[in-house]
Amino acid sequence: MKIKLAKTELIHFIGIGGMGMSGLALIMKGKGFRVQGSDISINKNIERLKKEKIKVLIGHKKQNINKATILVISSAIKKNNPEMLEAIKKQLPIYKRGEMLANIVSLTKNIVVVGSHGKTTTTSLIASIFQETKIDPTIINGGVICLLYTSPSPRDGLLSRMPSSA
């Protein structure tokens, strides 16, 4: 699925504090999009997003999406979420995290690590090889890789570790 996005879009992530959603928000910001989001409580991912100057609203209220033009939702979001209901009422495009991730991945060459066990470790090893050889891909990983920058950034290539729930 190709998602047409303009840099003027304001992408609102419902459930932005999750590992996958926070990483996706950072990548979209790094690609030049305006990004904000909401979650039910503060966690380390949200603190990291705020350091990167991403607006994060605590709690789910329909007012949170007043200026949003696109929504990205986590799989944890229920259909009766007030932000989701307001987006439906406003006829805003709503994408699942996996759909937005697939759109990003479709724009570049990729290495994808899949399997039952060891995906984060394998992705980390590949990332360290790239770092040592001065290849500079965007890395999407289900865990935090300590040897790398804490924020993803847009590159020409992409290394992705697909979570089981993608």
Region locations from a protein language model:
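ATP-dependent carboxylate-amine ligase
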Residues: M1-N45, K50-L57, K67-L71, A87-L92
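Hydrophobic alpha-helical segments, chiefly the membrane-spanning helices
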Residues: M162-A166
